[in-house]
Amino acid sequence: MAEDVSSTAPSPRGCADGRDADPTEEQMAQTQRNDQDQFECQELLECQVQVGAPDEEEEEEEDSGLVAEAEAVAAGWMLHFLCLSLCRAFRDGRSEDFRRTRNSAEAIIHGLSSLTACQLRTIYICQFLTRIAAGKTLDAQFENDERITPLESALMIWGSIEKEHDKLHEEIQNLIKIPAIAVCMENGNFKEAEEVFERIFGDPNSHMPFKSKLLMIISQKDTFHSFFQHFSYYHMMEKIKSYVNYVLSEKSSTFLMKAAAKVVESKRTRTITSQDKPSGNDVEMETEANLDTRKSVSDKQSAVTESSEGTVSLLRSHKNLFLSKLQHGTQQQDLNKKERRVGTPQSTKKKKESRRATESRIPVSKSQPVTPEKHRARKRQAWLWEEDKNLRSGVRKYGEGNWSKILLHYKFNNRTSVMLKDRWRTMKKLKLISSDSE
């Protein structure tokens, strides 16, 4: 998916360095967004007044199509809000918050049956930050091609986000290219550094003054050359954070943030103490309503995704893009092919159970740039898609129970025979044995 993704519509944003691409069009677009947000806020306030038990006749005549559309709109609000939270966690270096928000955004994307151009761009931003966060983890795989490093994948996604912007786009693009090579050299992978160089700078039509110098540095294996100081990892992160600040200022005007701000302002003006029971009841009612809505969104959209090939491809393609390692090798180009089917659809029940089973999976990375803290050693290691595939192949060849033989003939990541046995039992319970596409 990280290859040249055909955008469904031009980005409605101005230049990322603060300049307006087209003042007239930008102002018109902003006015339309503000009008739409104001309309949505008014609709929300009117709906709050009407909250109550529905009449039996209304309940019987409920328009399922209207409900599905309303849930899709709400999911879009949550997606934009989670993108904001992800940006803040990335900027502030809060690794645990980044991971939790990433997983929440992933869950929202699971339920999207279609994408607007704005939602697609929002997803690209989340994917880009996820790759950057895993930039120094060379074994983190985001593409079908196992050779592609996280920063290379981020570079390809970046080309899909900001192509129309010149200055900031070019600066970040160059600042990603050099660290992508430097990270390999820092890990002693000089052969891999040469391969990354060829993939990034191999275009004969590209004219960059430092290409020959960089190639010489790689051949000399000079990891600490002064050249890398001008294109350091730190400078790359700082420049990306400046872009993140731009996204935060842009998306702070989204509907959900405006509605939340109005609620906060209203509560402040009432000057109610923390021990005021009516206020507490109001908050509880709002929370319960939100939880009910969220549950409805999850149930309805899961039903929609099961019957739509395009939705299934979106679900499968975006899931691995948020995790630090690729779990479904055939999913990456789904969005590139405009939501065409690549994987096999999974049942709604299996999706929900699988999602619960993977919620606690945390990528292990000693040098993840967003993580100032060390991961706890007690965190369980996530099972990769390749490991599940090898386990299924091993059982087919040697039979269930021959775990030692399967472990000997297939590649697993520091697993034991007991782990294979437990994983097989889990896969059978979650119905992952024959439904996953290989």
From Swiss-Prot:
Residues with N-acetylalanine modification: 2
Q: Which GO terms describe its cellular component?
A: cytoplasm; nuclear telomere cap complex; nucleoplasm; nucleus; spindle
Its localization reads: Nucleus; Chromosome, Telomere; Cytoplasm, Cytoskeleton, Spindle
Print the keywords alphabetically. Acetylation, ADP-ribosylation, Cell cycle, Cell division, Chromosome, Cytoplasm, Cytoskeleton, DNA-binding, Isopeptide bond, Mitosis, Nucleus, Phosphoprotein, Telomere, Ubl conjugation
SUPFAM superfamilies xrefs:
Homeodomain-like, Telomeric repeat binding factor (TRF) dimerisation domain
Q: How is it modified after translation?
A: Phosphorylated preferentially on Ser-219 in an ATM-dependent manner in response to ionizing DNA damage. ADP-ribosylation by TNKS1 or TNKS2 diminishes its ability to bind to telomeric DNA.
Q: Where is this cross-link: Glycyl lysine isopeptide (Lys-Gly) (interchain with G-Cter in SUMO2)?
A: 213, 325, 366
DNA-binding segment(s): 403-428
Residue numbers of motif Nuclear localization signal?
337-356
Q: What is its main location?
A: nucleus
Question: Which residues in this protein are found as Phosphoserine?
Answer: 11, 219
Which SMART domains does the UniProt entry name for this protein?
SANT
Residue segments, region Interaction with RLIM:
265-378
Q: What is known of its domains?
A: The acidic N-terminal domain binds to the ankyrin repeats of TNKS1 and TNKS2. The C-terminal domain binds microtubules. The TRFH dimerization region mediates the interaction with TINF2.
What is the official name of this protein in its record?
Answer: Telomeric repeat-binding factor 1
